[in-house]
Swiss-Prot record:
GO terms for cellular component: extracellular region. It comes from the Eukaryota. Belongs to the cysteine-rich repeat secretory protein family. Keywords: Repeat, Secreted, Signal. It is found in: Secreted. Residues 27-129, 135-248 form the Gnk2-homologous domain. This is Putative cysteine-rich repeat secretory protein 5. Its main location: secreted. Disulfide bonds: none annotated. Residues 1-24 form the signal peptide. InterPro entries: GNK2 (IPR002902), GNK2_sf (IPR038408).
Length: 268
């Protein structure tokens, strides 16, 4: 089996193996394909793309990050995946497999593709993106309608926490999961107390300086959209920031107020 039949066989295998999980995740994905740079059906570019994505799928069961390259210029393909550092290997592999399926469904003949889900990032391109920080695209997911009664105090607490985590992450390139820091803090303020759980992570191909640059971009976007939200997730192509606060526990002298919550997703 050669040529286009091989490419469709790979896509069908992915479809039947992972379609159920992918359908449940599709609405939570940012899918970014090149719009005009299509490739021909017989191009060796597609074979190299299939090789890279297959390699990434296989490696996703043994680690939270990998990159791969296949082919010679001008048909070289570069690819990578990055799973959230708090995922186990099975969850990472499931996410990479489902995200790869989405690439085949949405970007089959495109020269580059990027998919960001809640749990992982998968991409490929004909241009090397290794070691680079990119400010677009990015995605923000956050709750609305459930902010604290003292948003300025909370925003200050959150940004101070993220500053500390970014510093720790930039110094952790040699850890088993590089550039990943996960932390929880109990916070008390006027209307009550809550637990603040925050996480920052960079792709291991970045150096410490570029890791910091990427995370600062994420904080900047967070500050502009959702630093008062109950939870938020900011994803760039090489880094991510997430946080969540527990239900407010009123102080003895304060009154508890129940508020509704919804989800907002913004993509740029």
């Amino acid at each position: 089996m050669t040529g286009i039949n091989t490419h469709f066989a790979v896509a069908l295998f992915c479809f039947f193996s992972f379609s159920l999980r992918a359908m449940s995740q599709a609405s939570q994905m940012l899918i970014d394909c090149t719009q005009f740079d299509n490739v021909t059906r017989t191009s060796s570019y597609l074979s190299n793309r299939d090789t890279v994505l297959s390699t990434l799928r296989n490696r996703s069961s043994i680690g939270s990050y990998s990159n791969a390259t296949a082919g010679l210029s001008p048909n070289t393909i570069y690819g990578m995946f990055l799973c959230r550092g708090d995922l186990n290997r099975t969850s990472c592999s499931d996410c990479v497999n489902a995200t790869t399926l989405e690439i085949y469904k949405s970007c089959f003949y495109r020269k580059s593709a990027l998919v960001i889900s809640n749990e992982c990032i998968v991409r490929y391109s004909n241009v090397s993106f290794f070691t680079l920080v990119e400010d677009v695209p990015s995605t923000a997911r956050f709750s609305t309608g459930n902010s604290l009664d003292s948003p300025q105090f909370f925003s200050q607490t959150l940004l101070e926490k993220l500053d500390a985590l970014i510093l720790r992450a930039s110094l952790s390139s040699s850890l088993p999961v590089p550039y990943f820091v996960d932390d929880q803090q109990h916070v008390t303020q006027l209307e009550g107390s809550y637990d603040l759980h925050a996480m920052v992570q960079c792709s291991p191909d970045l150096d410490p300086r570029n890791c910091t640059v990427c995370l600062r971009l994420a904080v900047q976007r967070l500050s502009g959209c959702c630093s008062h939200a109950q939870f938020a997730r900011i994803f760039y192509t090489k880094c991510l920031i997430t946080y969540e606060i527990s239900a407010l526990q009123p102080n003895v002298t304060s009154l508890g107020v129940t508020k509704s919550e919804s989800l907002t997703v913004y993509i740029i």
